[in-house]
Amino acid sequence: TATTRRRGRPPGFSPFR
């Protein structure tokens, strides 16, 4: 999921994907 794109970048997740 690319939901982190607007939330920022949590630990273990990429801001690009």
Swiss-Prot record:
Carbohydrate-modified residues: T3, T4
Superkingdom to which the source organism belongs: Eukaryota
Tissues in which the UniProt entry reports expression: Expressed by the venom gland.
Protein keywords: Bradykinin receptor impairing toxin, G-protein coupled receptor impairing toxin, Glycoprotein, Hypotensive agent, Secreted, Toxin, Vasoactive, Vasodilator
One GO process term, biological-process aspect: regulation of blood pressure
Role noted for this protein: Induces smooth muscle contraction. May target bradykinin receptors (BDKRB). May cause hypotension.
Family designation: Belongs to the bradykinin-related peptide family.
Protein name as catalogued: Vespulakinin-1
